[in-house]
Design a protein with these regions (language model features):
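Single transmembrane alpha-helix segments in multi-pass membrane proteins
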Residues: 22-84, 109-114, 256-266, 299
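Loop-to-transmembrane alpha-helix initiation sites
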Residues: 10, 42-43, 88, 117, ...
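Transmembrane helix-bundle core of multi-pass membrane transporters
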Residues: 117-184, 210-213, 233-241, 316-318
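Transmembrane alpha-helical segments in multi-pass inner-membrane proteins
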Residues: 222, 233-298
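Inter-helical junctions in multi-pass inner-membrane proteins, predominant
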Residues: 29-39, 133-135, 180-187, 214-250, ...
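Helix-loop-helix "hairpin" substructures at the membrane interface of multi-pass membrane proteins
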Residues: 87-95, 101-106, 110, 159-236
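Cytosolic-side transmembrane-helix boundaries in multi-pass membrane proteins
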Residues: 1-20, 175, 195, 202-209, ...
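Short loop segments and helix-boundary regions at transmembrane helix junctions
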Residues: 2-5, 63, 101-142, 180-185, ...
Length: 318
């Protein structure tokens, strides 16, 4: 029954995406042009990759509000190292490890001090946003040495034919994460931890370790998204990652994951991320003022949470 319900939710999200594409195509035929649609998928990359980590977390019953700040901090760190002509591969690895370290800090704060994830990661969101500003001196960082721009790290911002390489990277990450979630013990443990933590502990699952792993993955993929952004843009603005956490959480919840834990899929998250990108791109094409765009995403997020709450109550009664 649960498998049928999960498939029904995924099918519903896919139908929403298809309906949006049809409506926007009717309103602005340019929306479905190959160039624009590839751009929509490319715009999904950063949100999508970060949402992979958030999916693991939300399934295990937690969330991370600091992902945008991790994106900004690791991006500024990598850009500073690039600017200093540090070996690009080493700079890349340092940034990814920094993301893992921040994720580890979040995980320890939540599991060992029992501070609610919302409060703990809200605190680290503010802390590491300040760190990002401190690293950059409040200035955007750009114009990197040729040894950096010619390296494989910056190739991530290029294209393979008409398709941006970052889209292939996102696809690989989603496929691997989907397999881990659906076919491995680690994935089972995350579902068990979020679905019924007491029962999970009774059968020998270390729920604290599962949650810490989720936070580490979230930090790592947020840092990776920042590296891809640098490679594509060739710069890091001072506002890098600001507000990104809301888009990421919205994508996961739209994709059918439950804020109460124990439910969600990578396919659903990908479709949710696509919906966010389609809506944002469509609003630009329809000349909707920028200040309404985030407001609309907020409304969509509230509706998704209300639907999740309704479905959770229905499941409990059933």
């Amino acid at each position: 029954m649960k498998e049928k319900l999960k498939s029904f939710r995924e099918l519903g999200v896919i139908c929403v995406l298809i309906a949006l594409i049809i409506l926007l195509t009717l309103a602005r035929p340019v929306f479905i042009s190959p160039t624009n649609f590839i751009n929509v998928v490319r715009q999904t990359v950063q949100i999508g990759i970060m949402a992979v980590g958030m999916t693991f977390l939300i399934i295990s019953g937690e969330m991370d509000l600091s992902v945008g700040s991790i994106f900004g901090t690791t991006g500024m760190l990598a850009a500073t190292l690039y600017k200093g002509n540090v070996n690009p591969t080493l700079a890349f690895l340092i940034a990814i490890l920094a993301g893992c370290a921040i994720g580890l800090l979040n995980g320890v704060l939540v599991t060992k001090t029992k501070i609610p994830a919302f409060i703990a990661t809200l605190g680290t969101m503010k802390i590491f946003r300040s760190v990002a500003y401190a690293i950059s001196g409040g200035q955007s960082i750009s114009v990197f040495p040729e040894s950096v721009t010619n390296s494989w790290v910056f190739k991530m911002g290029g294209s393979l034919g008409p398709i941006p390489i970052q889209i292939f990277i996102m696809a690989v990450i989603f496929i691997v994460a989907g397999i881990v979630l659906a076919k491995t013990e680690a994935g089972y443990n995350m579902y068990a931890t979020g679905g019924n933590p007491k029962a999970a502990n009774l059968v020998g699952i270390n729920t604290d370790r599962v949650k810490i792993l989720g936070f580490i993955i979230s930090g790592a993929v947020s840092a990776l998204a920042a590296m891809i952004s640098i490679a594509y843009l060739g710069s890091v603005p001072t506002t890098a990652g600001e507000g990104r956490e809301m888009d990421v959480i919205a994508a996961v919840i739209l994709g059918g994951a439950s804020l109460s834990g124990g439910r969600g899929t990578m396919l659903g998250t990908f479709i949710g991320a696509m919906i966010i990108s389609v809506v944002k791109n469509g609003m630009v094409l329809l000349s909707v003022p920028v200040f309404w765009q985030d407001g609309f995403i907020g409304v969509v997020l509230i509706l998704a949470v209300l639907l999740d709450t309704f479905m959770h109550r229905k499941d409990s009664r059933g």
